[in-house]
Amino acid sequence: MSALRRSGYGPSDGPSYGRYYGPGGGDVPVHPPPPLYPLRPEPPQPPISWRVRGGGPAETTWLGEGGGGDGYYPSGGAWPEPGRAGGSHQEQPPYPSYNSNYWNSTARSRAPYPSTYPVRPELQGQSLNSYTNGAYGPTYPPGPGANTASYSGAYYAPGYTQTSYSTEVPSTYRSSGNSPTPVSRWIYPQQDCQTEAPPLRGQVPGYPPSQNPGMTLPHYPYGDGNRSVPQSGPTVRPQEDAWASPGAYGMGGRYPWPSSAPSAPPGNLYMTESTSPWPSSGSPQSPPSPPVQQPKDSSYPYSQSDQSMNRHNFPCSVHQYESSGTVNNDDSDLLDSQVQYSAEPQLYGNATSDHPNNQDQSSSLPEECVPSDESTPPSIKKIIHVLEKVQYLEQEVEEFVGKKTDKAYWLLEEMLTKELLELDSVETGGQDSVRQARKEAVCKIQAILEKLEKKGL
C-alpha cells in the first residue's frame, strides 16, 4: 500500500503525497489541493460505513476500483485518476445495492465464477432428480443448460449423464418419449434384450447350448455372471414365454417365481412330486442335467438341499423345491450325504411313544405294541397312552416323601384318578383283548394308588 500511495494512486493520500509525488512533480501549485481536499473527507467515510454496515459500501468501493482499474490497482493514471477514484467514492450510493455479494461488486460481470457457483445447488437438485426418477430431468435443466452439462459431467461422465441417466430412467420407469429408447434398452434390458438374450445365452461357452432345440434360452440378468456354474438353463426353456412377456426390468420377467408357478402343474411349490415339474422337457433332459449339478453344489452349497437345483441355475428359483428326486437319481447318494431331512422316513409312532417316556422302563410298553401298530385298534392305543402316563406317575409316587396333607400327594392322587377315568372311557367293542388290556391297566393304577396311600400315612 505504501508503494501505491507513493505512486500517487491511493484515494486516501494526503496533500503531502500529492505535493511530492503528484503528477505535476515537485511542489504542486495551490490548485491541486482544492481538488484533492474533497478526497480527504472521503477516506474517513469507509470506516463509518464499516461500523454501520459491516464493511459493505467501503469495501465494495475499493474492490470496485480494483476491478475497474480506477483505485488501488490501476493500470496507470495520476491524480486525475484519483479524481475519478473520488468520483467512484461519490458513486458509493449505488454500490450498497450489491451488499448481497459482499464487497465483490464486479462479481456480476464475472459470469463464470459467481454464476456457476450459485447455480450449483440447483444443479445438484437437477442431477439428482433426473438421476433418481427422471421426472424432473426436463424441468430444471432449461435454465442453465451449459452449466448443467459441465457440472453434471464433473460427477457423472457428461455424455453418459445426459444420455443414459436422464433419458434412460424416464423411458424405463415412465416410458416417456423424452429419451431415446435404445439407450434405456441397453441400460435396462427390455423387449429388445429379451429377444437378444436367448441367443446370447446359447452362444456362451459355459452354458450347454440347447438340448431342447425348440426351446430358447432365458436371460438371467444376475445369473449370467457365474460361468463356473454351468447353467442347465435349457431345462427352463418351457417358461421362455413367461420370461420374455413382462418386458419391464424387474420382478415380473426376470425372476422365475411367476413363470415357475405355472410350470409346476401339481401346484405345490415345495417338494410337490417325484416326477419332473417340466411338462415338456422333464424326461429328455434328465440325463444331461446331473453332470451340471455337481459344480452347482460347489458354488451354491445351500442349493444342495434341493435336488432339483441342478436343473435350474437360479439359486432362488422355486423349482429347487419341486422335483425332489427326478433327475439326479445317480447323484442321490451325494445329496443324501449333504442334505439331512429332519427325520423324514421315521415312523412317528415310535417318536410319540418314546418322547413322553423319559424312563427306560417306559419304552418297553410302547415297543411291545408298535409292531402291530397299524392293526392296533384305537381303544388299545388309548390304553397304551394311559399306561405311559401311569408309568411316569408311578415313578413320581416312588420318589414321593410326605403326608396326605401335602400338595404333591393330592396332585399325584388326582392324576392317577384321572387316568383311571380315562381307562373307564375306553370302549371294548366286544373284543376280549381290549377288555383284558383295560383291566390290567386299571389294576396297575389301583396298585400305584395304594402304594401312594401307604407312603402318605
UniProtKB/Swiss-Prot annotation:
Modified residues (Phosphoserine): 7
Record has Glycoprotein as a keyword: no
GO MF annotation terms: adenyl-nucleotide exchange factor activity; protein-containing complex binding; protein-folding chaperone binding; RNA binding; ubiquitin protein ligase binding
Bias kind Polar residues: ranges: 166-182, 320-333, 347-365
Domain of life: Eukaryota
UniProt keyword annotation of Phosphoprotein present: yes
PROSITE patterns the record matches: BAG
Keywords: Chaperone, Cytoplasm, Methylation, Phosphoprotein
Chain intervals with Low complexity compositional bias: 8-20, 274-284, 294-308
GO cellular component, one term: membrane
Residue numbers carrying Omega-N-methylarginine: 40, 53, 108, 185
Positions of the BAG domain: 379-456
Biased composition (Pro residues): 30-47
Subunit structure: Binds to the ATPase domain of HSP/HSC70 chaperones. Binds to the death domain of TNFRSF1A in the absence of TNF and thereby prevents binding of adapter molecules such as TRADD or TRAF2. Binds to the death domain of TNFRSF12. Interacts with PRKN.
Function description: Inhibits the chaperone activity of HSP70/HSC70 by promoting substrate release. Prevents constitutive TNFRSF1A signaling. Negative regulator of PRKN translocation to damaged mitochondria.
Descriptive protein name: BAG family molecular chaperone regulator 4
Annotated source species: Homo sapiens (Human)
Lineage: Eukaryota, Metazoa, Chordata, Craniata, Vertebrata
Gene assigned in the entry: BAG4
